[in-house]
């Protein structure tokens, strides 16, 4: 078997084959489920690439990913509003948005690197781009291959394309290392965009009122968390590699853009504080241990203002991008679900690969639509038909928070220590309120998308193990 390098390897193969067929200076990249919704989209992109003032600087023009199947209640945050409506416009004011894997028009020469220069030695180019004579000609001539101009037969063109697409063509070359899409991460788009902007290239974000491209967004929990795990793995892989934005150099990228890249590579590490907030205050509440200032304490207002300001900022961003209060709840819920599961598993996966414990893997998002699952999504009901790996932590933490909330109220009534424990009681209440659909899936719902009884039992056992472990640890202490 040969390493195929996942999507990066496939895109590099297409890049080589297209070089001897069309050799177009600009390349449109779309995922298999995306289609053009605005015929002027290419013209919009080319206007930036051919602008007489800035034409030499943009490596790619990025369009937002938009989806035709987003329900009014976007319970899975499938529209990825925070990225395409808040972050990317902000990045456009710096060196430009990140490369997002689809819906972009990129310069071919940007992917070839600095090796292709006027008067370059063809033999030297073969060290970087491989042994294909026709492909080397395409680098130097900036025109279609002679095989298309009638000098050779169609069969020869087909043989050349097969040669360029062969599994071993990229061996002993710079493909995936310095040429084309980089192989070092399953988030090949993010990494390649970072490498391009580090070399001084810029990017442009175009988001017009009419969607330029449309595709299929995720409509069930399994696809959401599988996709999130893959993205988390890729981002952490970049963050712990030689391409870490905080340390990579020399770089021609502006400082703020580097910090934005670095922030994205750290995003999966939200799993750590989220797991702490979902367990430590609750366990201490069960044991009657206060962690935060009481309501009567003057420092209480600091914690209150931190929480309110964080929610207010998030809500303000949502309102200014056309969202609603429902969008705030859905995004908070998805953020919690992903942090507890996808971000944790993705981070662990990246570190295990780094340590050589396991090989790289690429879990593609399912693009096929299931009518039953789509109906649940359109009705605003979560489809909990996913693996135990994803469900068990979510259900176990909900059970733990239910127990701590009940104990907290009992202490408030019987002992009267709500003043001391108010913040911890509120944290449990907030987690349960945001994640009410999980409780609904455990107790109320009877359809196929409910949480299976076996998962509830397993999660209850997991919760009890956590409680007993903490209890034994406290006794030993």
Per-region residue spans from a language model:
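A short beta-strand->alpha-helix segment at the C-terminal rim
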Residues: 474-477
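Basic/Trp-rich segment in TM-proximal cytosolic loops or flexible interdomain/linker regions
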Residues: 164, 220-224, 230-426, 438-459
């Amino acid at each position: 078997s040969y390493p195929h390098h996942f999507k990066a390897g496939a895109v590099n193969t297409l890049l080589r084959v297209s070089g001897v067929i069309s050799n177009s200076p600009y390349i449109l990249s779309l995922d298999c489920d995306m289609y053009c919704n605005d015929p002027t989209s290419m013209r919009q992109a080319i206007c930036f690439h051919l602008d007489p003032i800035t034409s030499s600087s943009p490596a790619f023009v990025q369009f937002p990913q938009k989806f035709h199947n987003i329900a009014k209640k976007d319970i899975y945050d499938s529209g990825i509003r925070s990225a395409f409506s808040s972050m990317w416009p902000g990045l456009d004011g710096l060196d430009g948005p990140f490369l997002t894997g689809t819906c972009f028009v990129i310069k071919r020469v940007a992917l070839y690197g600095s090796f292709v220069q006027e008067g370059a030695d063809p033999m030297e180019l073969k060290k970087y781009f491989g042994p294909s004579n026709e492909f080397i000609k395409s680098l130097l001539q900036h025109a279609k291959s002679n095989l298309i101009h009638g000098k050779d037969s169609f069969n020869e063109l087909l043989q050349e394309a097969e040669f360029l697409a062969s599994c071993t063509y990229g061996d002993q070359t710079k493909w995936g290392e310095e040429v084309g899409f980089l192989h070092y991460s399953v988030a090949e788009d993010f990494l390649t965009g970072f490498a391009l902007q580090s070399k001084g290239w810029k990017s442009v974000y175009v988001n017009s009122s009419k969607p330029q491209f449309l595709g299929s967004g995720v409509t069930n929990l399994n696809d959401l968390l599988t996709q999130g795990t893959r993205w988390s793995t890729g981002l952490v892989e970049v963050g712990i590699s030689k391409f870490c934005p905080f340390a990579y150099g020399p770089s021609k990228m502006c400082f703020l853009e580097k910090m934005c890249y670095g922030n994205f590579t750290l995003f999966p590490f939200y799993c750590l504080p989220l797991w702490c907030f979902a367990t430590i205050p609750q366990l201490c509440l069960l044991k009657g241990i206060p962690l935060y200032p009481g309501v009567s304490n003057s420092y209480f207002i600091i914690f209150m203002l931190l929480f309110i300001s964080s929610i207010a900022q998030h809500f303000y961003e949502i309102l200014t991008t056309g969202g609603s209060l429902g969008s705030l709840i859905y995004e908070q819920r998805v953020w919690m679900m992903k942090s507890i599961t996808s971000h944790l598993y993705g981070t662990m996966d990246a570190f295990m690969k780094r340590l050589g414990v396991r090989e790289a893997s690429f879990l593609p998002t399912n693009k096929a639509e299931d009518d039953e699952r789509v109906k649940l999504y359109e009705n605003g009901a979560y489809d909990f038909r996913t693996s135990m790996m994803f469900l068990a932590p979510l259900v176990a933490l909900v059970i733990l928070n239910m127990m701590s909330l009940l104990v907290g109220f009992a202490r408030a009534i019987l002992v009267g220590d709500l003043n001391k424990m108010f913040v911890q009681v509120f944290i449990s209440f907030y987690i349960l309120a945001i994640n009410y659909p999980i409780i609904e899936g455990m107790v109320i719902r009877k359809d196929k998308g409910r949480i299976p009884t076996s998962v509830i039992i397993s999660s209850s056992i997991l919760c009890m193990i956590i409680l007993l472990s903490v209890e034994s640890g406290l006794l030993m202490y």
